[in-house]
Amino acid sequence: TRWAQVRVENDTLVTGYRITSGWARTNYTYFAMSFSKPVREYGARDRRPLDYGGGWRKFDTERNFPEIGGCGIVMHFDFGDDSAPLEVKVALSAVGTRGALANLCAEAGGRTFDQAAADAARKWEEQMSVIEAQGSDEALRMLYTSLYHTMINPSVYMDTDGKYRGVDHEIHQTRDFTNYTVFSVWDTYRALHPLFNLICRDRSRDIVNSMLAHYRQSVHRI
C-alpha cells in the first residue's frame, strides 16, 4: 500500500480509498461500506506510521477520529449489541468515492444478504448453463469447475454509469461496450478467447473493445 484514506461519514457509512503498486502500477481503489446497525465506537491505527504527522499529531486519531490516512491502516468497529446479525455492504470503484457510493446504491440498494446471495446463485447458474454435458459425476465436476474458472477473469472494470479509470489514469466514459481488465493474453489467447467466441460472443466483443481502448490510452501503444 502506497497510501490509504478512511472517512467515517456517519454511524452507518464508511468511505475511503487505497493506492497500491504491484502488478498494476499506481492502482486506485475507492470503496463505500455501509452497516445495517450503527457503529458505537471505532478506532484506527497505522502499522507503518510516518515520522512526522504535522498538525495531526495534536489529535488522538486512534479512537473515534473520523478521518485517518496512512500506509498501514487497520481499523475496528464496535456495534454493541450482537443479538441480531450484522450485514455489511461494500462497493468498489476505480473512479472515485462518488462512484463507489453510486455503485453501492445501484448494486446493493435495499437488498438483504439472502437476496444478494440468491441473485448471485442465479447469475452463476445462467453462466454455467451455456454448456450442456453428460458424463460421470467426476467428469461433470471437472468440466463445470473449469468453466467457472474461465468466468472469473477478465473482469468488469467500470462503474454502473460506464465511467472507468484508463491506463492513462484519466477518467473515461463508455456507452457502447463494457470495459474489462485482467487479460493475461499471453496465457489465454490459445483456448480461453476462442471459447468465448463460441459461448459468449457479446463478452468477447466487449473484451476486444476494452483492449482497443487500452491501446489508445497507452503511451506505449500496447
Residue ranges and their predicted role:
Residues 1-180, 213:
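Beta-sandwich/jelly-roll carbohydrate-recognition scaffolds of carbohydrate-active enzymes
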Residues 145-158, 181-205:
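Alpha-helical support elements that line or immediately flank enzyme active sites
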